[in-house]
Amino acid sequence: SASYASLLKDQNVQPYVRNIAKFAPVPFDNGLALPAKYLVFTRAKAVTLTAQEMTEKVAASTSVFAANGAQTLRFGQIITGNDIGQHLLGVSYQSMSAIEATYDALAQDTNFRQLTAGVEVNMRSIIQLYT
């Protein structure tokens, strides 16, 4: 598209990886209207869990994300590129303190502990958004 071409040419962006993910049906509606300031992406490879089990564990943990400040949450499987078959969790937040509170609470959540025990996390990125 023209927008993508402009991003590469005018903004001097150089993508080093590009993937497409198929999102899983994980209900999440925190209802927060504030604009997100941070995105956290976590990529993981299944070790002992099936894709269905991973989706169920993420879905069972969404209340912990919401209670600690997550604004949006999406989970899916990467279907193109170098990381095909791996899973991606994307969550938006208003602040770094909300990210920290969420991960502190997730460490106590049985479903999330079972999820992390059954996968190999191989990438986590925190991206600050500027508006």
Model-derived features: positions:
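Short S/T/G/P-rich N-terminal loop/turn motif that feeds into the first structured element of a domain
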Residues: 1-131
